[in-house]
Structure formats: C-alpha cells, structure tokens
C-alpha cells in the first residue's frame, strides 16, 4: 500500500497557571510510522531555537529553553518573571525563523470544591475511587478540569495525570450542587513495553491503595481551553483503540500548519490520605 506523504506540523503546547510561570513545549509532529529515538527527538522533533514570548499588562518576557521537571519530556521554554494571576489575560508569541504563531488565554478565578472523599463500594472494598461534590456558580458559565497525582508505597507520579472525565462544563447543572466520580485516566501506553506485569498493574491503575496520598487539582478553564481538553476526553477513551477513528482536536494557536494549545489554568489542590488502617468514607484533609 502506498501511503501519501505526511506533512509535518508545528506543535505548540503551552500553559500558565495561577502562582506559576509559563511553560511552553515547541516541537514538530512526526509520521506515525517514522522511527523515534532519543537522537531523533533531540535533533528533529524538539525545536530548541524558537523565540517564545509571553506578555501580560504591557510587560513581556522571553522564555528560556531549559531543563524542566514539570515538562513531560524534561525540556521546555520556561518563564521566571511573569507569574500567573487570576483574572488576567496572557498573550503568547512563538517565532520560528520567519514564521510567527500567536495565541491568548485567560486565567479564571480559582474554584474550591465543597468536598472530596474516597468512595468505597462496600465495607470490604480496599480499592476506592474518588468522588467530589461541587456547587456551581449560577452567574457564570464554568468549564471544569481535574488532574490527579498519587504518591504511594510504590507508585509516585512525577506529573499530574489527567482524570476521566477530563473536562466538562456546567450546561446540565448550572447553579446546582452535584457530585461526580473522578477516575485516574490511564496514562500513555508509551512505556508499557518496558514494564513488568506488576509494574503495569501499578502504573495503570485507576483506583487507590492503602498508603496512598492522593492530590486532586481542580481547574477552571476559559472556553477555548475547554474545547481542547474536552476533545481530549474522547481521545483518552478511544484513542488507543485501533478500530476507532481519531477525533479532530481544536487548536487555539494562530498561524500556518500548526496544532496545539495555549491554556490558562485557575487551580486549587486538595489532598486525600488513605492510611493503612483506613475505613470507608474517610474524608478529605484540606490544605
């Protein structure tokens, strides 16, 4: 079978969160069947010479390409001086040679959950999930996103893991008090081939075990960011099924031949503990 030539795209994945500087990863997409190794990533995928600038309230900062523990690939363009604040707009400008890409995002006001708890099926259940209760603001149209981290006896998430559902709006419960089950979505299967069965069982689990400390990040998004992350809900649910077609994921980056997202997060973090002697319905300790 002769496959058509693949046209590579510029990929811009950027974020800024209340209390943190901006982080942007700039790369090129690759053919599905192209060989991928460390040398290819460093020399052909990551773009290390872009000029990445973030602006807010008339102040601009050029981000520096550096090692970054918060980046999935340990490398990113990172800011220092402009720190995310609720209610402010942040403009992104990326220059690659003579080509310019731009985007804007807003950090909303942070939102606090009413409560979050470990949800047990019955008194004998030892692998709970998490449930949340929230009261929606009837005066605004809100867009919610959740992420999770586990620090356990064996599993220690370095990055925030996307939940399922990834993101949703308040169209069906505006102004109401509701509760949802929030599951730890399976991370990428990229590393599965290098894991033992025991490691896979630990890494890809959606429930919690005794000794876990669970961090839940609740974020409010602006509308453009919500469109991107809500589309990712579908991709996470069926994207690794070879019999399903991938869905188009919206892009809020302006420019030619580009995909990606520049997203502002208004976030709060709650902490749950599941000690070895835990009983059903142990409640949140809020920080």
Can you annotate each of these PLM segments?
Residues 1-287:
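A sequence/structural signal for flexible, mid-protein segments enriched
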């Amino acid at each position: 079978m002769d496959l058509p030539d693949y046209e590579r795209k510029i990929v811009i994945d950027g974020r800024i969160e209340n209390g943190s500087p901006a982080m942007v990863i700039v790369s090129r997409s690759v053919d599905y069947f192209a060989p991928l190794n460390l040398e290819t990533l460093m020399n052909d995928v990551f773009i290390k010479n872009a000029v990445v600038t973030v602006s807010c309230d008339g102040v601009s900062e050029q981000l520096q390409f550096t090692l970054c523990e918060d980046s999935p690939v340990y490398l990113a363009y990172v800011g220092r001086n402009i720190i995310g604040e609720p209610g402010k707009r942040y403009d992104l400008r990326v220059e690659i040679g003579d080509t310019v890409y731009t985007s804007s995002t807003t950090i909303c006001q942070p939102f606090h959950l009413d409560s979050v708890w470990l949800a047990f099926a019955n008194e004998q259940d030892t692998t709970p999930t998490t449930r949340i209760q929230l009261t929606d603001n009837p005066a605004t149209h809100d867009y919610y996103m959740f992420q999770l981290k586990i620090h356990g006896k064996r599993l220690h998430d370095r990055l925030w893991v996307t939940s399922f559902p990834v993101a949703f709006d308040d169209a069906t419960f505006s102004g109401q008090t509701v509760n949802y089950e929030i599951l730890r979505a399976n991370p990428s299967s990229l590393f599965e081939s290098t894991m033992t069965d025991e490691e896979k069982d630990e890494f890809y689990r959606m429930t919690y075990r005794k000794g876990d400390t669970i961090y839940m990040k609740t974020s409010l998004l602006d509308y453009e960011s919500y469109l991107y992350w809500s589309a990712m809900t579908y991709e996470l649910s069926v994207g690794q099924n070879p019999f399903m077609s991938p869905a188009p994921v919206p892009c809020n980056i302006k420019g030619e031949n580009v995909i990606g997202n520049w997203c502002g997060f208004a976030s709060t973090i709650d902490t749950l503990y599941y000690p070895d002697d835990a009983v059903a319905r142990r409640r949140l300790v809020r920080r």
